[in-house]
Amino acid sequence: SVTSYGLSAVVPLKDVVPEWVRIGFSATTGAEYAAHEVLSWSFHSELGGTSS
C-alpha cells in the first residue's frame, strides 16, 4: 500500500522574500497557443541572515 500526502498553501512571496529577489517561469511549445499550469513548485534558500 502506498500512502501519499499533499499540502497546499497560498504564500504572498512579497511578504517573505527580499525585494531584490526575482522569480520567473518560462514554457513553450511548437504551437501558436498553449496553456501551461504550474502543478508543483519548490523554493529553497540558504541565504545567511541575522536572528532577532
From Swiss-Prot:
Transferase found in the keyword field = no
- The disulfides recorded in the entry are none
Q: Output one GO MF annotation.
A: carbohydrate binding
Protein's recorded name: Mitogenic lectin alpha chain
Species of origin reads Vicia sativa (Spring vetch)
Identify its protein family: Belongs to the leguminous lectin family.
Q: Which InterPro entries match?
A: ConA-like_dom_sf (IPR013320), Lectin_LegA_CS (IPR000985), Legume_lectin_dom (IPR001220)
Quaternary structure, per UniProt, is: Tetramer of two alpha and two beta chains.
Q: Which UniProt keywords apply?
A: Lectin
Q: From what superkingdom does this record's organism come?
A: Eukaryota
UniProt signal peptide: none
